[in-house]
Amino acid sequence: MLTFARQQQRRNVRWLLSLSLLVLLATLLSLCAGEQWIAPGDWLSARGELFVWQIRLPRTLAVLLVGAALALSGAVMQALFENPLAEPGLLGVSNGAGVGLIAAVLLGQGQLPGWALGLCAIAGALIITLILLRFARRHLSTSRLLLAGVALGIICSALMTWAIYFSTSFDLRQLMYWMMGGFGGVDWQQSWLMIALIPVLIWICCQSQPLNMLALGETSARQLGLPLWFWRNLLVVATGWMVGVSVAMAGAIGFIGLVIPHILRLCGLTDHRVLLPGCALAGAIALLLADVVARLALASAELPIGVVTATLGAPVFIWLLLKSAR
């Protein structure tokens, strides 16, 4: 038994080291790739100062943090709702952020600065989170709370569609493109959003013990002494914050929170002590590679990153559905 535990521990360490190396390689690729390939040796040149340090570096950092946040949100939700198909958009938080953003554009008549739009997106996400907490205080089961999140997401999606469809504002049409996900507008002015993600990411990565208990089911978690109501509310708020900040920075990006945790579990990383940092690293890798594809796929334009992740994630999602039905 001791030998098996040591082998498992070494295997987990190898996984995390490998993922860390891949994050480094994907980061280097993201900084080099673009309309002009800039090798690391040219990063200190005048061209590198502009393209690498002022344009690509803030974008790369944002992609890293958003990828980690979405994957961690998926891992938390899958443990919280005991459903391997749960993902961040399922609770309606992403759509709530979109409603907040569109409301800001309508009320501000397109005159609000970017930081104000970001705050409105976060506020929209947190409002949906507070509504979910209201449901949670009624001691609903996780399945009913999940259905409440789906219903809220549908309502928010309908509100966004109505607002965009009847609007003649160019800004709202641009927001429709933005809601497909993209990092094209990210620069150092959004650094406050990146900073807002970091403490929550670190805190979530340290919550392996309650998540391991929650993954066993509500009954087992109660028997082990976990204050279920407290932790469920706290984790819903943390998930809402991560998703809200991510949507404010990059729009709605799907499938990262669904696919990454499930793939890592299939690879044997079931303990949340390893799964959580693994999800953060793997989510960052996946979104970095998707962002590179979005930048390079077309010569004259940039693909929405949500299109890239959906194209790659939809077949995996169908496979997961078929696998869970067996």
UniProtKB/Swiss-Prot annotation:
Pfam families, per database record: FecCD (PF01032)
One of the GO biological process terms: cobalamin transport
Key words, A-Z: Cell inner membrane, Cell membrane, Membrane, Transmembrane, Transmembrane helix, Transport
Ranges annotated as spanning the membrane: 17-39, 59-81, 88-107, 111-133, 146-168, 188-205, 242-264, 274-296, 303-322
Source superkingdom: Bacteria
Molecular function in Gene Ontology: transmembrane transporter activity; vitamin transmembrane transporter activity
GO cellular component, one term: plasma membrane
Subunit structure: The complex is composed of two ATP-binding proteins (BtuD), two transmembrane proteins (BtuC) and a solute-binding protein (BtuF).
Function: Part of the ABC transporter complex BtuCDF involved in vitamin B12 import. Involved in the translocation of the substrate across the membrane.
Name this polypeptide is given: Vitamin B12 import system permease protein BtuC
Lineage, opening ranks: Bacteria, Pseudomonadati, Pseudomonadota, Gammaproteobacteria, Enterobacterales
